[in-house]
Amino acid sequence: PSLALERLSMLKGNGAMCVVTAVYGNRAYEDTLLQMQDYAQTAGFQVIAAISAVAEHSIIRKYTAGRPNLNDYKGLAEFGDRILEKAASGALSTPVVPGNRPYKKAGAGMIPQADATCTACGLCAQKCPSGAISADQLKLPDKSKCISCMRCVSICPVHARKISQLMTSVAADESVMVDGKIDMSKVN
């Protein structure tokens, strides 16, 4: 998301080696690795490796049923060993990563809302990584800050934060998805 790229642009790599990583819900990560590689290099990092790692999809669980699994963990451990070997050897070539220039335009993200069962405990505001939920406005997240990570949904003790059933159904229909987000122009 743009927030991650904004924060990455504040870093100063000073030639330090780095590995760019895209964690995704076993669906698609589009231009993420390329964008991160570009931003990391601009910030002065030497990108020596890149990986896309599967994780549980934060909205549509069917995409990652049973993932990550033991094979995924084994693959990550082997990748880590190869990175260490590469760094130790001094053969620090820049990886070729998938993606498009110009980057594909991202669609609108899905913003979780609190329903009437919200107890106003404030945990969502405390734990939101992007500051999209204000302690003063718990039920109205700032759409410009929300990165659709679903942290608020996963930690709500009363399960009051949700994506609407309509949006969840639409997201499950891959024909309306563009770059991992819903393209409303494709919704009937």
Q: Which residue stretches match the model-derived regions?
A:
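Generic preference for hydrophobic/aromatic residues in regular secondary structure cores
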Residues: 111-114, 161, 182, 186
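A mid-sequence, solvent-exposed acidic-amphipathic segment
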Residues: 94-129
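FMN-binding flavodoxin-like domain, especially the glycine-rich phosphate-binding loop
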Residues: 1-107, 166-187
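Short linear motifs in intrinsically disordered/low-complexity regions
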Residues: 116, 135-137, 143, 174, ...
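Iron-sulfur cluster-binding cysteine motifs and their immediate structural context
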Residues: 114, 123-147, 151-168
